[in-house]
């Protein structure tokens, strides 16, 4: 092939059309002596993917560099590259993936797999030098609308993200998670469980994808604020039938009720320990009803922007108490630049 067809395209590459490497049953996958258990995960992933692609399983081993056999695919740790960078070299008798970190080796593995999917068992020679342009490469996944995905479906999504070097998955949950003590909200929703989140988080770590929790803690808490236990915390009383518009446009917490903050804290305490990421997206968008109902009297001393920020800061502080770095949507605060 005269061009590389890769996503994303590497920063630089040099093709060597006259050079060919043949993937055969005698090809070994070799880890250098500096490689660790994370690098073994990359090697085993390559082994598994190649078995599915070409029909035979290559052996995996580890040795000192001077003992490399040929033909082989070599995972080599070096000192001089950036954190997520890698070099991929395809020569006639060997393939080398070089990186300073396990992330780099993993990304080099993904690039090699793309090349093999394009070319088959006879690979053209190439020298690739690559490093992602952006430190945060995220995908936001809302699992609250329609069918809740099962764990295997989410794992499949993680595999696809990792293949394209996406390193962050923000998982948006509301009633699609089985919060402890909230069964009236999720009992008929087939929600994700705490155990499934733990397993997904572990799966993400092995593929260098950061799993970031995200859920509503201020506005559009539709299922929570329509429940018998918590409907008294809704800014506007609502007994209407379900509609997609009302699901998003209403059901904001009553910030004048101290129990609203207690609810927020309870939800956080139930979910945050399940995620290894330090990041937490607290939502806090689309608080359309704020100050229009039960909390209206607070506007005697605060404007609606100040009312929003005051409760937002309380939520942020709870998250910080759990040692989390907070993200939130900016649709509301951007209307009040002075805040």
Regions from the language model: what does each represent?
Residues 1-137:
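Contiguous, structured surface segment used for ligand recognition
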Residues 15-17, 126, 267-268, 335-338:
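A generic local structural motif
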Residues 33, 62-64, 75-77, 215-217, ...:
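A general secondary-structure junction signal
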Residues 134-328:
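Substrate-binding cleft of carbohydrate-active enzyme catalytic domains
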Residues 104, 287, 333-335:
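Short, solvent-exposed loop/turn segments at secondary-structure junctions
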Residues 327-339:
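Substrate-binding cleft/loops of secretory-pathway carbohydrate-active enzymes
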């Amino acid at each position: 092939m005269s061009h590389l067809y890769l996503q994303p395209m590497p920063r630089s590459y040099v093709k060597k059309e006259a050079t060919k490497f043949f993937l055969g049953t005698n090809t070994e996958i070799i880890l250098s002596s500096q490689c660790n258990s994370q690098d073994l995960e990359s090697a085993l992933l390559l082994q598994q993917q190649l078995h599915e692609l070409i029909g035979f399983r290559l052996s995996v081993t580890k040795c000192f560099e001077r003992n490399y056999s040929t033909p082989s695919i070599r995972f080599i740790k070096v000192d001089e590259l950036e954190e997520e960078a890698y070099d991929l070299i395809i020569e006639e008798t060997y393939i080398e993936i070089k990186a300073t970190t396990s992330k780099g080796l993993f990304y080099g593995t993904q690039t090699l797999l793309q090349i093999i999917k394009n070319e088959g068992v006879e690979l053209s020679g190439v020298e690739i030098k690559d490093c992602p342009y952006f430190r945060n490469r995220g995908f936001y996944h809302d699992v609250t609308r329609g069918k809740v995905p099962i764990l295997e479906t989410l794992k499949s999504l993680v595999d696809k993200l990792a293949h394209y070097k996406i390193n962050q998955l923000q998982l948006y949950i509301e009633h699609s998670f089985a919060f402890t003590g909230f069964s009236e909200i999720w009992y008929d929703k087939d929600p994700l469980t705490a155990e499934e989140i733990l397993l997904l988080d572990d799966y993400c770590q092995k593929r260098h994808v950061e799993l970031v929790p995200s859920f509503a803690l201020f506005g559009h808490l539709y299922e929570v604020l329509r429940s018998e236990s918590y409907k008294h915390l809704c800014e506007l009383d609502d007994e209407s039938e379900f509609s997609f518009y009302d699901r998003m446009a209403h059901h904001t917490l009553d910030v004048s009720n101290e129990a609203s903050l207690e609810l927020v804290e309870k939800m956080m305490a139930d979910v945050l320990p399940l995620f290894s990421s330090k990041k937490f997206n607290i939502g806090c968008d689309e608080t359309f009803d704020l100050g229009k109902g039960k909390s209206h009297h607070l506007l005697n001393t605060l404007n609606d922007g100040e009312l929003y920020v005051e409760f937002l800061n309380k939520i942020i502080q709870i998250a910080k108490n759990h040692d989390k770095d907070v993200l939130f949507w900016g649709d509301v605060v951007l209307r009040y630049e002075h805040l």
